[in-house]
C-alpha cells in the first residue's frame, strides 16, 4: 500500500514528474491518484498515471482528478485486442515525438506535424487494433458502463476471497479492504512454487491463472516472494459464480 506521507516527503520543488501506477497488476491495490496529483502539483511537478490495470474497470476523470498524462493498454479492462493502447494528455502538456516520419500528412517534411495526435503517430497505425478497441468500448457502454462492469467483477473477487480465506495454507497478498481496487486476488499455497500451482489448476480444472513475477520484480522483493512468485487470479466480466466456486474447490484440493 502506498505510503502517502512518505511520498509527500519525497516530492520536492525539484521533482519534475511523479509517475504512479493506478492499480497494481500483482495485488490489485489501488492508489488515490487525485491525492497524488495534488501532491505533485503542489511541488510544481506533473503527474503521469499508468492505468493499464484500471482502465475500463475504474472511473478516471482526468480533469476532476488533476491528471496530466494517463497511459493505458487496450487488451485488459477495455476489452480490446492485444497490441493496442493509448496516451491521454491534458491540454497544455507538451510531449515530444519519439519517432519521426511516415504520417502521410506532411510527407515532404522531415519532422513530425505539430498538431495532435498526429505528432505522436509516426508510421502506419494499427487500424485493425483500433477498430477492435473501439468495439470493446462500445461493448462496455452497452453493459451499463465502467461502474457496472467493475461492480460485477468486484463481486466475483470478493466471493473468491471469502472462500479461499478459509483454507489454512493459503497466503494472500493485497489490501482487500480498499473501497476501490482491481478485481485481482493473488495468493500462494504453502511453500509450493507458484508455477506448479498454476499448472495444476490448468491441467486439472482448466483454470487459467498467472504465476511468477508479473513483470514486477520490485513488488515481489517488497512482498518477499522473489523465489516463489505469486499465483494471480484476475476476475473478468465473462466469469461466473460457478467458475469462482470451482476455483475455490480446486485450491482446497491442492492445499491438502
Positions of PLM-derived features:
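Pyridoxal 5′-phosphate
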Residues: 1-256
Amino acid at each position: 500500500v502506498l505510503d502517502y506521507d512518505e511520498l509527500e516527503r519525497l516530492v520536492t520543488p525539484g521533482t519534475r514528474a511523479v509517475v504512479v501506477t493506478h492499480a497494481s497488476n500483482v495485488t490489485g491495490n489501488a492508489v488515490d491518484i487525485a491525492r497524488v496529483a495534488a501532491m505533485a502539483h503542489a511541488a510544481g511537478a506533473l503527474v503521469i498515471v499508468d492505468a493499464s490495470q484500471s482502465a475500463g474497470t475504474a472511473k478516471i476523470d482526468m480533469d476532476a482528478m488533476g491528471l496530466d498524462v494517463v497511459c493505458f493498454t487496450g487488451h485488459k479492462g477495455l476489452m480490446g485486442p492485444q497490441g493496442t493502447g493509448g496516451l491521454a494528455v491534458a491540454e497544455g502538456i507538451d510531449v515530444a515525438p519519439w519517432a519521426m516520419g511516415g504520417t502521410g500528412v506532411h510527407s515532404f517534411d522531415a519532422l513530425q506535424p505539430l498538431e495532435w495526435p498526429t505528432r505522436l503517430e509516426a508510421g502506419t497505425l494499427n487500424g485493425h487494433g483500433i477498430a477492435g478497441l473501439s468495439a470493446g468500448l462500445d461493448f462496455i457502454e452497452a453493459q451499463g458502463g465502467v461502474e457496472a462492469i467493475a461492480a460485477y467483477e468486484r463481486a466475483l473477487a470478493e466471493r473468491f476471497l471469502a472462500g479461499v480465506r478459509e483454507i489454512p495454507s493459503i497466503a494472500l497478498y493485497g489490501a482487500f479492504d480498499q473501497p476501490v481496487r482491481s478485481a485481482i486476488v493473488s495468493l500462494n499455497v504453502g511453500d509450493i512454487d507458484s508455477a506448479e500451482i498454476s499448472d495444476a489448476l490448468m491441467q486439472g480444472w482448466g483454470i487459467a491463472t498467472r504465476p511468477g513475477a508479473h513483470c514486477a520484480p520490485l513488488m515481489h522483493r517488497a512482498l518477499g516472494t522473489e523465489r516463489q512468485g505469486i499465483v494471480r487470479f484476475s476476475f473478468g466480466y465473462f466469469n461466473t459464480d460457478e467458475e469462482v466456486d470451482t476455483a475455490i474447490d480446486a485450491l482446497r484440493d491442492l492445499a491438502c
